[in-house]
Design a protein with these regions (language model features):
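Short aromatic-enriched loop/helix-cap "lid" or pocket-rim segments at secondary-structure transitions
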Residues: 47-51, 142-143, 176-181
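The feature marks non-catalytic terminal segments
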Residues: 160, 179-188
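Short acidic/polar capping segments at secondary-structure boundaries
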Residues: 92, 133-137, 172-173
């Protein structure tokens, strides 16, 4: 069975990012995948980014997956063995969350081949995507803020494992009660309108994304099995 792993890089287990990931899971499940969600900010997880131990570069050592022993290592093992991988994160000051960046460091660096950069050390082909949520109002402002350089670059590095794509949800509803916070920049009425009109469309995009990735993975596997 196709295995699809979903990584929530938001501290909130039911926030905008998590909701989109769960909807993508619905699509993947509908397409026949076995799905699993990991919350990186779960208090039971104790880990950091790359520790520069270079264990993944030792001659004759284990290749293609981070072997540093901590709570993230088993999750990384699942990630490199998955058929589909979908990561999600809020935009924090123009970057993915620190938790997701640490995950990406640990997943992607073992794939870097210091003997031949053109031949990454990849254990299997993975169809992947990254879902971003943010206050940024639209794609035009997203580009004006140079977010493609800061955020898309991080997401596109997953392309070393196979085809990858990015889904952005703009102008998201951030607070349950805007009156409680110093946030005069935002129009609470407008935010609520976007939540009620645009966010459901983004949820549908996430559903189709999850389904599409699983279907793409199955097509790729069928092509390989046919020896073509």
């Amino acid at each position: 069975m196709t295995k699809a792993l979903f990584i929530n890089g938001s501290p909130r287990k039911n926030g905008n990012t998590a909701q989109l990931l769960k909807r993508a899971m619905d699509g993947a499940r509908e397409a026949g995948a076995e799905v699993e969600l990991v919350n990186l900010y779960d208090r039971s997880l104790n880990y950091k980014g790359c520790m520069s131990c270079f264990a993944c570069k030792i001659k004759g050592g284990k290749k293609g997956v981070c072997s540093f022993k901590d709570d993230l290592q088993p999750i990384l093992q699942k990630a490199v063995e998955a058929d589909v991988l979908v990561c999600g994160s809020p935009n924090y000051c123009g970057y993915p969350s620190a938790a997701l960046r640490a995950f990406m460091e640990r997943m992607e660096f073992p794939a870097v081949n210091y003997s031949d950069y053109s031949k990454p050390v990849v254990l299997k082909r993975i169809c992947s995507a990254t879902i971003y949520t943010m206050n940024c109002p639209n794609e035009e402002v997203y580009r004006q803020m140079n977010y493609p350089i800061l955020m898309d670059t991080a997401a596109q590095q997953l392309g070393v494992f196979g085809p990858t794509e990015i889904l952005c949800s703009y102008d998201t509803y951030q607070f349950p009660n805007y009156d409680r916070y110093d946030a005069a920049t935002f129009d609470a009425t407008h935010k609520a309108e976007v939540r009620d009109t645009q966010f459901p469309k983004d949820m549908e995009k996430a559903y189709k994304l999850g389904k599409r990735l699983v279907e793409q993975c199955k097509e790729d596997n069928s092509f390989e099995d046919a020896g073509q």
